[in-house]
Structures are given as structure tokens and as C-alpha cells.
Regions:
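Nucleotide-activated donor-dependent transferases that construct or modify glycoconjugates
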Residues: 1-11, 36, 133
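Beta-sheet entry/capping signal
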Residues: 2-4, 30-32, 130-131, 153-157
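Short N-terminal targeting/anchoring amphipathic segment
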Residues: 6, 124-138
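Charged, amphipathic alpha-helical stretches
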Residues: 8-21, 33
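Short, well-ordered alpha-helical microsegments
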Residues: 12-17, 40-41, 140-143
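Conserved N-terminal ligand/cofactor-binding loop architecture of enzyme catalytic domains
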Residues: 22, 26-120, 161-188
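Glycine-rich, histidine-containing beta strand-loop boundary motifs that form or position
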Residues: 35, 135-136, 143, 158-162
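Glycosyltransferases and closely related glycan-assembly transferases
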Residues: 124-128, 144-156
Length: 188
């Protein structure tokens, strides 16, 4: 049985709640709901999701340690990113690519990255996710999730809106950290 994580943040609840229900109904897939924060958790509960839901922000608060990160941990992160991205990103490149990290000190950005790495490692051990659905890898916590999926031979997916036929919009399913689109690949 495949395990799919639906990582709910902001408006993704609107999309992922019915997706989760459809996957549950189809059978053969275990759906795990991950809420970004307490607001998303409340929305999931209001939508009738009653099972256990991990709250990402609570877990990061538990795992984050202020102050300089141990150089050994930084070397581990660097090697993990290089391997998972097939050489496209090292730790420094990933830190510089996060659109939110310019607001933080280097110690804070490295500490958060280590907390994200520990979270996704624990989460993957607990649930053995074959796929994570969330949003593009423009923030470190998404990039780290994609790297953990790659390490397990799994997939990191995210939907984007694209102009469809006529005046409508469709969702395209993208994968990985490099903006690969299986939908387009199949059609080409």
C-alpha cells in the first residue's frame, strides 16, 4: 500500500481535503494529513478529518535549537543535499535559494534547516511516505522534504495553476525540486 502525505498550508486545504477523500475512497492508498499550523489543523477538523494530524510548526519548535549549528551537522546537510539533488544544490545554494531566509541570520537559517531535516527524517521514519504533496520548493522546508523523498526513492509533488483550453485554468502536477512536469512529459 502506498502512503501519500498531504501537507496542508493556506489554501491547499481547499484542494487537498477532497483529494484525500478521493484517495481514501479509491483504496490502496494510505493518506497522511500534515498541517502547517494550528489554523490548518482547525480547518481540517472542521472539514471532518478526525484522524491523527501532525502540526509542522509545533514539531519545528520542538526541534529548533538557537545558536550556531555543529559543523558536523552542516557537513551532513551539505552531503545530503548534494546527493538528493544529484549535485544541483549544496547547503549554501539551498540556503541562498530560500525566499524567506534573507530575513534571518546565518545561524538562524542553518538552525531551521537542521530542524527541517530532523523533522522530515523522523516523519519519514514514522510514516514511510512514498509521496508528499505540497507546494513548489521555494522555501527550505519544501526543499528538505523533496530531498527526503529523493533519498527514499519517493516523489515530491505540487500542483500549479496553468492556463487551460479556452478561458479556464487547470492544475498541472509538478514533481521534485527542479520543476519537472510529468503531465507535460506524457503529452510531449
Amino acid at each position: 500500500m502506498k502512503t501519500i502525505v498531504l501537507f496542508h498550508r493556506l489554501e491547499l486545504n481547499t484542494l487537498f481535503v477532497p483529494v484525500g477523500r478521493a484517495l481514501d475512497s479509491a483504496g490502496g492508498v494510505r493518506v497522511v494529513h500534515l498541517a502547517y499550523g494550528s489554523e490548518e489543523l482547525a480547518q481540517l477538523r472542521a472539514a471532518g478529518i478526525t484522524g491523527p494530524v501532525t502540526v509542522f510548526k509545533d514539531e519545528i519548535r520542538r526541534l529548533y535549537r538557537p545558536g550556531p549549528v555543529d559543523p558536523g551537522d552542516l557537513a551532513e546537510l551539505d552531503a545530503f543535499f548534494l546527493k538528493g539533488s544529484k549535485g544541483a544544490f549544496n547547503l549554501n545554494a539551498a540556503l541562498q535559494s530560500d525566499r524567506g531566509f534573507p530575513l534571518l541570520s546565518l545561524d538562524e537559517a542553518q538552525g531551521l534547516t537542521l530542524a527541517y531535516h530532523r523533522f522530515w527524517g523522523e516523519f519519514q521514519q514514522r510514516y514511510g511516505a512514498d509521496a508528499v504533496l505540497h507546494e513548489p520548493c521555494t522555501l527550505m522546508f519544501n526543499f528538505v522534504a523533496a530531498m527526503h523523498c529523493a533519498a527514499r526513492g519517493g516523489d515530491y509533488f505540487y500542483p500549479i495553476m496553468a492556463q487551460g483550453p479556452g478561458k479556464g485554468f487547470n492544475h498541472l502536477l509538478m514533481s521534485g525540486f527542479d520543476f519537472t512536469c510529468p503531465d507535460l512529459d506524457r503529452r510531449l
